[in-house]
Amino acid sequence: MPAQIISGTELSKNIKFNVAEKIQHYLQQGKRAPGLAVILVGADPASQVYVGSKRRSCEELGIYSKSYDLPAETTEQELLTLIEQLNQDPQIDGILVQLPLPKKINSTKVIEHISPTKDIDGFHPYNVGRLCQRIPTLRACTPLGIMKLLETTGVDLYGQHAVIVGASNIVGRPMALELLLAGCTVTVTHRFTKDLKSHVHQADILVVAVGKPHIIPGEWIKEGAIVIDVGINRVDGKLVGDVQYDEASKKASFITPVPGGVGPMTVAMLMFNTLLAYESHS
């Protein structure tokens, strides 16, 4: 029986609708709108597309959005000074610095400079540490979105063997903490992992976030597994994931499509986090 599709498009619409409803409720009480500052350094085309999508979502949901499109020549100190000003701005609840930054700017230093209560990307060491200690507040958007997608399957995650392919700070590592928090037994694989196939084949829940098209053949998938494909790759003018979708969907019980799976959830959770940050500041 072919896998059931987990639609991030549908779920993200529901989450955004709920966020917009709450914002309207606050506005009707005479309160200010949540505020989000979006910083883009340079003119990377992919980053411009992502930032545009985030700004449109803010507009749709009633979030006050302030844009800072800085030239590629911007120095690290200039960026840190702007972040410091936004940290102090009572109208701004969330600060988003679009990554990647130009090579001359230290991304870690920039992330650490954002106030943890305004870190709606969930990348600040303080927020990652809280997740590690099982007391999360603002959580990384893509892993949190994936947890929401997993909830829709109705599968009890306790005791499930979750395997993550990819150990990035943005997805793989916080994803491991999220799944651990949910009661899974977690294996994280990376470029030094030996015999990747055997690890993948043991996965009840497989999360792949590498950014290499079809790196995971469908035949590796365990019968009945839940497959979450985070990869977005362009091949011959089409968007494809990191998992060989057609073959994997014959073996999996649930699978996310590319596009329309994890992608829409990331922006939805960004809006969700902005609302959370706003509520904590109110």
From Swiss-Prot:
Pathway: One-carbon metabolism; tetrahydrofolate interconversion. The keyword Flavoprotein does not apply. CDD domains: NAD_bind_m-THF_DH_Cyclohyd (cd01080). The keyword Manganese does not apply. SUPFAM superfamilies: Aminoacid dehydrogenase-like, N-terminal domain (SSF53223), NAD(P)-binding Rossmann-fold domains (SSF51735). GO terms for biological process: L-histidine biosynthetic process; methionine biosynthetic process; purine nucleotide biosynthetic process; tetrahydrofolate interconversion. NADP(+) binds at residues 166-168, 232. Keywords: Amino-acid biosynthesis, Histidine biosynthesis, Hydrolase, Methionine biosynthesis, Multifunctional enzyme, NADP, One-carbon metabolism, Oxidoreductase, Purine biosynthesis. InterPro entries: Aminoacid_DH-like_N_sf (IPR046346), NAD(P)-bd_dom_sf (IPR036291), THF_DH/CycHdrlase (IPR000672), THF_DH/CycHdrlase_cat_dom (IPR020630), THF_DH/CycHdrlase_CS (IPR020867), THF_DH/CycHdrlase_NAD-bd_dom (IPR020631). Catalyzes the oxidation of 5,10-methylenetetrahydrofolate to 5,10-methenyltetrahydrofolate and then the hydrolysis of 5,10-methenyltetrahydrofolate to 10-formyltetrahydrofolate. Belongs to the tetrahydrofolate dehydrogenase/cyclohydrolase family. This is Bifunctional protein FolD.
